[in-house]
Amino acid sequence: MPSYIVVGGQWGDEGKGSIIAYLAIHDKPEVIARGGVGTNAGHSVFINGKKYAVRQLPTGFMNENARLLVGAGVLVDPEVFFHELEHLKDFNVRGRIGLDYRCTVIEPGHKELDRSNGYLHGKIGTTGSGCGPANADRALRKAKQVKDLKELEPYLTDVAQEVNEALDEGKLVLVEGTQGFGLSLYYGSYPYVTSKDTSASAIASDVGIGPTRVDDVIVVFKSFPTRVGAGPFPTEMSEEEAERMGLVEYGTVTGRRRRVGWFDFEFARYSARINGATMLAVTMLDKYDKEAFGVTDFNKLPQKAKDFIAEIEEKVGVPVALIKTGPELEHIIDLRENI
């Protein structure tokens, strides 16, 4: 598995961060590269009971031997970047991070426009992080790049070059996606989408990896999908039902309450197909079956949980390789050896 990509299969907030964190520690990749849109998506991980949330830097930061990279396709907010360098100082991130010199900069004006635009903020439900306006300026070829900012000079690199050289040397490369397939500008429920494609193909392009150099694609699904902001959500349940089932969540970036729904097998199959999934990861199985909490051996899962995993594999047509049964890093079942 010289290179693999982890992407969300629903509308974001699938728990990609917890899967990426596990892979970063367990598999020990030498390079961890982040693709995706920008600072409009947050990944949360729990390490020794402490919660860390990142919006700009790779979620695999806790692997202190890995080179951390942010691909050319990612938007960079200097304010968020430097905040996270300080936030993660215990992990020596500052000495390991590289930004592709071609990344577009999110400027204060982009954030102001994002938050003040009635259409984006009201109808679409933007996070207000400035990503949409920044990508618009990029498409118009008038945006700044990180190479234009002196304060970012120490961190500049050619991410595509680094990643491909690492692959040439047989190193393990982990690529992180952000948000989810259902928010893709191309394949999501337009116009209630993000400002670019979020599929595995796009994430590979973000960091400069050609399609023939991707060995595995892990698509992450949450047992009860969630969505922040407006847009179609066919299996959505009522807020009252979500409260009764203990499924109330709030967005990492926006703080807004997430809409909750039942697992949509048809959408999951479509998502896995377009992303080219070779493996699936299922998170928050303990929310589906509370007796599954903390279980690390598949054979010890309660039957209800086993049946749910079997149904996903049958209806989606892709094997489930990783199962999260709780918030901590060690709350996971790894079935990759059986695939």
Swiss-Prot record:
Its cofactor is Mg(2+). It is found in: Cytoplasm. It catalyses: IMP + L-aspartate + GTP = N(6)-(1,2-dicarboxyethyl)-AMP + GDP + phosphate + 2 H(+). IMP binds at D13, E14, G15, K16, N40, A41, G42, H43, T127, R141, Q179, T194, R256. Keywords: Cytoplasm, GTP-binding, Ligase, Magnesium, Metal-binding, Nucleotide-binding, Purine biosynthesis. GTP binds at residues 12-18, 42-44, 258, 284-286, 324-326. The active site is at D13 (proton acceptor), H43 (proton donor). The keyword Glycoprotein does not apply. Its main location: cytoplasm. Pathway: Purine metabolism; AMP biosynthesis via de novo pathway; AMP from IMP: step 1/2. One of its GO terms (biological process) is IMP metabolic process. GO terms for molecular function: adenylosuccinate synthase activity; GTP binding; magnesium ion binding. Substrate binds at T252, V253, T254, G255, R256, R257, R258. GO terms for cellular component: cytoplasm. InterPro entries: Adenylosuccin_syn_GTP-bd, Adenylosuccinate_synth_dom1, Adenylosuccinate_synth_dom3, Adenylosuccinate_synthetase, P-loop_NTPase. The keyword Magnesium applies. Mg(2+) binds at D13, G42. Binds 1 Mg(2+) ion per subunit. Its EC number is 6.3.4.4. Plays an important role in the de novo pathway of purine nucleotide biosynthesis. Catalyzes the first committed step in the biosynthesis of AMP from IMP. PANTHER family: ADENYLOSUCCINATE SYNTHETASE. Belongs to the adenylosuccinate synthetase family. Homodimer. This is Adenylosuccinate synthetase. It comes from Thermococcus sibiricus (strain DSM 12597 / MM 739).
